[in-house]
Amino acid sequence: MAKAKFERNKPHVNVGTIGHVDHGKTTLTAAISHVLAKTYGGEAKDFSQIDNAPEERERGITINTSHIEYDTPTRHYAHVDCPGHADYVKNMITGAAQMDGAILVVASTDGPMPQTREHILLSRQVGVPFIIVFMNKCDMVDDAELLELVEMEVRELLSEYDFPGDDLPVIQGSALKALEGEPEWEAKIIELAEALDSYIPEPERDIDKPFLMPIEDVFSISGRGTVVTGRVERGIVRVGDEVEIVGIRTTTKTTCTGVEMFRKLLDEGRAGENCGILLRGTKRDDVERGQVLSKPGSINPHTTFESEVYVLSKEEGGRHTPFFKGYRPQFYFRTTDVTGTIELPEGVEMVMPGDNIKMVVTLICPIAMDEGLRFAIREGGRTVGAGVVAKIIA
């Protein structure tokens, strides 16, 4: 069967549902799918199709996630929903499903619960830029004052984690009633969709960001100079552009004198392409795998950062035993392993396989990094954890 052609005529935005267990994330996902399909066209997905999330592997970690798509008049959305709390933690830390914005689902019958807080904290740590709140099960609360209290509580909680709690959209609705086709509650789903359209800005495309290419290999071509190869992560590099070589050693500047792809000479290399870049006056020994080539000033090398880490369970092929402070694994960034030491939060003595934890990492040599960069933790080439740079310290 031929796949439907992917129409790229609308901006594409990635979103997802987050929130406490049983607050109605999957029901809301189904309600959005149904109401928007009914209103704007498209295919509706049922609760059971979404809830039966297929198992995926991302960097060796088993994650269950459901992906659905829907349209509003101006945008195309890809929406991710996870069945279990552990799946959310893994998903957000590995960046398996990068979110341009999240819909925080809070049952108005319960108010914010422990996982509500944890998902907000994770969103802050992994750099989810925007949150919209959907207060669910409002059909079960008769008291308008109670709804107001829950809304205040959620807004305060978001402000506590540096989200603009006072200004972000909060929609009071009932996912189940909307799914059952009751017009007053369907209207709330449309209101939510309008909030997604207006509150989450259109994401910047990779190609519009400053140029960056992780260096995978280095060759010297006699009579031409040194060529570095890799896949362009973002931006565009053109022949004649000044570039920096960042990470591991002192940052140096050079000029791109040629771009090659599949043995053909090109004028430029773009995000997503594997290419070779010829560097002016750079010696073979001046560059190595693990460094990055970037637009001057766009990224800096760092050694110390706060991170949010998920430690693989034994079943996922991770460690069988906990680790303690003083643990010195390798941290794999983009194309290379760098040894580092860890500092655990106060009062935490050990970390068990299957845990997620905030830790401060100090690398033995600097690596080009931004907040939001993903990494793997490895021991002798085997992945034992996944993490994300939450905050750069030095």
UniProtKB/Swiss-Prot annotation:
Catalytic activity field: GTP + H2O = GDP + phosphate + H(+)
A Pfam family hit: GTP_EFTU_D2
Molecular function GO terms recorded: GTP binding; GTPase activity; guanosine tetraphosphate binding; translation elongation factor activity
Region (G4): 136-139
Record-listed Mg(2+) binding positions: T26
Record region (G5): 174-176
Stored InterPro entries: EF-Tu_GTP-bd, EF-Tu_GTPase, EFTu-like_2, EFTU_2, G_TR_CS, P-loop_NTPase, Small_GTP-bd, T_Tr_GTP-bd_dom
Record keywords, A-Z: Cytoplasm, Elongation factor, GTP-binding, Hydrolase, Magnesium, Metal-binding, Nucleotide-binding, Protein biosynthesis
Gene3D superfamilies, A to Z: P-loop containing nucleotide triphosphate hydrolases, Translation factors
The keyword Secreted appears for this protein: no
Hydrolase as UniProt keyword: yes
Region (G2): 60-64
Record-listed E.C. numbers: 3.6.5.3
Spans annotated as G1: 19-26
Location of the region described as G3 in the Swiss-Prot/TrEMBL record: 81-84
Start and end residues of each tr-type G domain: 10-204
Subcellular location: Cytoplasm
GO cellular component: cytosol
Cross-referenced HAMAP family: EF_Tu_B
Family: Belongs to the TRAFAC class translation factor GTPase superfamily. Classic translation factor GTPase family. EF-Tu/EF-1A subfamily.
Assembly and binders: Monomer.
Name this polypeptide is given: Elongation factor Tu 2
